Amino acid sequence: MAIPSEEARAQSIRTALAAAEKRSDVERVRIAWKDTDLMATVVEIPLSSVVLNHRSHRIRAQLESSPRAEFVRRDPFSNEAQDVISELLRDTGRFDELRDNLKDRGQLDPGVVTHTGLLVNANTRCVALRELRKRHIRVAVLPEDATEEEIDRLELRLQMKRDFRRDYTFTNELLHCCPVN
């Protein structure tokens, strides 16, 4: 699959943002951004409109020790580099569990993306959605003036944030899927 150009990805995101802003039920999420809260618009865009983040903290160490790291350094948005990143993300803990959860429940939380389609958060979800042959991903879009440093800080903060949701017990899971009348 050929990766669309940065401009093509940006245009896809601009189009989705414009359509979302026209809707009365536009979805927004709060993101801690530049010492304030940003209410970022959530859009559903084609998976082809996003690229995996080669600077992701989740895979940085694995990437540095990979024999194929040079492909990523040389051209992080090439097919080969994106394949390397995908493989590293698949090898992170609990990938199969995440993929199975997406298969069963769909994407519950939006990822975060730059205006040019670089994933800040949801890289692993993107790989899993592609593996499931899904066509779209839900993402909150950052402002166009976001710098690399701000993006890196946000990505680290989002990755380090603890998820306090607890698993359902077996009984509650059954009640959820098979209500008793």
Locate each region found by the language model:
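Short, charged/polar connector segments at secondary-structure boundaries
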Residues: 1-138
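Amphipathic, charge-rich alpha-helical segments that serve as recognition/docking helices
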Residues: 82-89, 133-181
